[in-house]
Amino acid sequence: MKTFILKVTLIKENDSRWSAIIPDLPGCSSWGYSQQEALENIKDAAEVYIEDMIETGQGVPSPSDRIEIFDEPAIAVSL
């Protein structure tokens, strides 16, 4: 089993929802009515995204080399 640690960006939307994106997985996004729900949903989305990449032979992108400090949380996805 392999574990991926992925940085997540959470954005508070005007309609009280939270959007979640993973910059290292282009197009991988989700949302929730709370920060916690958005994190749970983005973890599920990341698992599907990574499983699909592995199954189709695309390989999983490496984390970005940029050095940045994030206040946002990270998630761990184990496959």
Predicted segments, located by residue:
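A detector of short terminal or domain-flanking linear segments
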Residues: 1-7, 11-12, 29
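Short, charged, surface-exposed hinge/linker loops at domain edges
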Residues: 1-6, 41-79
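Short aromatic-glycine-(Arg/Gly/Cys) micro-motifs in beta-strand/loop hairpins
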Residues: 11-25
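An amphipathic alpha-helix/helix-turn recognition signal
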Residues: 15, 33, 40-41
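Short amphipathic alpha-helical segments
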Residues: 19, 36-39, 47
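Hydrophobic residues in alpha-helical membrane-spanning segments
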Residues: 24-27, 62
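A short, exposed loop/beta-hairpin motif centered on an aromatic-Gly-Thr core
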Residues: 26-37
